[in-house]
């Protein structure tokens, strides 16, 4: 699977399927029970996509895919947060029935969980971005808090994801027995000679160079006659 196919697959994962929102019904909130079943389906899709990404064994490709995917994920999260706050949707209330609000609710829950998966499976790449982005930090703190109150993550196989993510990112203090289940290297500091870090630096330099070239091309052009004046 090439880069474009991967990006197309991940972009679909950032948005909830219409079958999820269409199936929700409320009566003393059985909608939550129904949503949790649909959430399970979405989670299987997300985890399969990440498994395929991990099997690429190409740091540069993984970097490019996660670069695009993370930016898209946080844009969706930010837009959905705005919608929910504007409508005074409470996370511990019933699952919203308005189509727009249901979508926003699903976006927050599913993308927060998905980001947790990415954090735990690709911690070095995520820290490379996240640790210097205060806006992402604020958004994911809000997302974790929102999700913790929805009841979606109560019990079940996905209940630990929010806590593990918060500890890995340093949002909450690490438990004495904390261990990222997907991290093979448990050292606190990554040596500068680490080949992964080297690849990240090279990719970052290449990306910045490309951005500078684009800026130069966009800049105003001075004609020869103007430059001679």
Curated annotation (Swiss-Prot):
One protein family per Pfam: ERK-JNK_inhib
InterPro entries with a match to the protein in the record: Coiled-coil_dom_con_pro_134
GO cellular component, one term: cytosol
Gene Ontology biological-process annotations: angiogenesis; embryonic hemopoiesis; embryonic liver development; placenta development; positive regulation of MyD88-dependent toll-like receptor signaling pathway; positive regulation of Wnt signaling pathway; regulation of ossification; regulation of protein glycosylation
Region named Disordered: 182-229
Coiled coil, from the record: 196-218
Signal peptide as annotated in the record: 1-22
PTM comment text: O-glycosylated, with additional sialic acid modifications.
Role this protein plays: Molecular adapter required to prevent protein hyperglycosylation of HSP90B1: during translation, associates with nascent HSP90B1 and the STT3A catalytic component of the OST-A complex and tethers them to a specialized translocon that forms a microenvironment for HSP90B1 folding. In the CCDC134-containing translocon, STT3A associates with the SRT pseudosubstrate motif of HSP90B1, preventing access to facultative glycosylation sites until folding is completed, preventing hyperglycosylation and subsequent degradation of HSP90B1.
Family: Belongs to the CCDC134 family.
Name of the protein: Coiled-coil domain-containing protein 134
Gene that this sequence comes from: Ccdc134
